[in-house]
């Protein structure tokens, strides 16, 4: 992996390890499963070390274990690196990792929690 983002080489390798894609660095996109592509997309979004992350359905195509890993990763980034992580999802399993949850109904906030 060539260094082009804002993360150090060690931080990048740690991120790839946490996402379970470190071993995929030499593969071509057409060799990846849907879930692997999703995790690569998350790594690409985090590679520039943004202060705000807007993730639209970040757990699509992921199994339950990977959903937990992504939830823990986002929660950890919010707490330790003070990042704002905004997740738009239908996957209610991610609620447990959120500080606040807003439910939308007909384009309006219908419920707040947290």
Regions found by a protein language model. Give the residues of each.
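Conserved ABC ATPase "signature" region
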Residues: 6-24
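Conserved ABC ATPase signature
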Residues: 28-32, 36
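Hydrophobic anchor residue at the start of the ABC signature
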Residues: 42
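Conserved catalytic motifs of ABC-family nucleotide-binding domains
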Residues: 49
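Catalytic Walker B motif of ABC-type/P-loop ATPase nucleotide-binding domains
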Residues: 53-56
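Helix N-cap at the start of a conserved alpha-helix in ABC-type nucleotide-binding domains
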Residues: 64-66
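Helical segment within the ABC ATPase nucleotide-binding domain
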Residues: 68-80
């Amino acid at each position: 992996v060539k260094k082009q983002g804002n993360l150090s080489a060690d931080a990048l390798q740690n991120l790839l390890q946490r996402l379970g894609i470190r071993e995929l660095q030499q593969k071509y996109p057409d060799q990846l499963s849907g879930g692997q592509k999703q995790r690569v997309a998350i790594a690409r979004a985090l590679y520039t070390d943004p202060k705000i992350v807007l993730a639209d359905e970040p757990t699509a195509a992921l199994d339950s274990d990977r959903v937990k890993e992504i939830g823990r990763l986002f929660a950890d980034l919010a707490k330790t690196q003070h990042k704002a992580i905004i997740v738009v999802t239908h996957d209610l399993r991610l609620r447990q990792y959120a500080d606040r949850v807003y439910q939308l109904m007909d384009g309006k906030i219908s419920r707040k929690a947290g």
